[in-house]
Amino acid sequence: WHLDGPYRGGFTPPGPRRQGFDTWAASDCCHDYLKAWYYRDDPEPIWIDGYDADHFTDLTIQFMRAQAGVASRAQRPFCAFLSWAPPHNPYEVMPAAYKVHDPDQMILRPNVPAEDEALARTQYAGYFSHITALDRNLGRLRAALAELGIAENTLVIFTSDRGDMLRSHGLYEKQLP
């Protein structure tokens, strides 16, 4: 999430930049969601086959399953931090199954300039399709918590740094408040 400095896109070696996490599967600023990569404990990237939000959700569920077994035996809690890249742009990069919003059906904000309307409709549809994909993945996480019998004893915190302009006032990302 690049909150600890200007380091972007590279390997984070074990140490203080991992902020105390014992298990690491991370990529900083990889926004090619169908050709993404991440790193574990060595500088060789691991390439993802498929949509990266699905893959990182799979990894988190695997981690939760492993930790739930350890926690039940040792009565120890665990923490998992999952930071999906979508709905960061590019908005059109996703599997066809997630492209569920029709650009022609998008209702634009009234402050989108007329010359930006076609592009804005495409961006809205992609943005909302990414959000739909994340909703499905959050549902998968919650189902895994229930399956593991730990949903009632788990705190799920959902937050986001997104909120792009999507052509409001002719602007694209979050350049202005």
Regions found by a protein language model. Name each.
Residues W1-H2, A85:
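Alpha-helix/helix-capping structural signal
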